Amino acid sequence: TGSGNTPQLPKICMELGRGIKGLIGHTQPRRLAARTVANRIAEELKTEPGGCIGYKVRFSDHVSDNTMVKLMTDGILLAEIQQDRLLMQYDTIIIDEAHERSLNIDFLLGYLKELLPRRPDLKIIITSATIDPERFSRHFNNAPIIEVSGRTYPVEVRYRPIVEEADDTERDQLQAIFDAVDELSQESPGDILIFMSGEREIRDTADALNKLNLRHTEILPLYARLSNSEQNRVFQSHSGRRIVLATNVAETSLTVPGIKYVID
């Protein structure tokens, strides 16, 4: 994890001659991740999204006749099977974040195993940070396992229970977040990432933090239903401190730059 394999794998496939007889399909569990990864690969190749690097998510299709790598959600690939049972438009398929084991991902893994005997030319790559690789290898008839070393950094963990054992008064989650933000405001500069369970919780917390009028601090929500421009704000350069409130999309599917502190 953290090795940068998500944007690099499709480029390696292209260098090996894949993506010519068919597309290199690359699935992500979330729309935001699919779009962000496509933009990142296009940027590294000094091209625009929609050219040789395209993406397709619900309500947005940026794939052209020149596209070689197609980022998409796993739901899009699953839907395409209805019209293209042999997935003939692809010569390579990368299933990313397989450890999430969603219904879509599990259906795809089962279907692709059944498909491979009929499509011996099709290359399947399953990637993940945390899955049991031997188990997935056995599922695909003892497929080879390639391990990529991740990058780790020293982490200090501070436990701040919402309910103190010696104190009967119970803080709510919002107050616990305020206290944590206040504690981190005494530390050296760096952006804060707060993990939350869903959109409503994020909106309510963002409203509450904005009312505190924290100096030189920008509050940024990050969830699937935000517009593209609002989501892209987390990747833009900025001054001062940022507090990003996100679902677990920021845990595995994409990297938010500048984060030094995490409140979970």
Give, region by region, the residue ranges found by the protein language model.
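P-loop NTPase motor module signature
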Residues: T1-D264
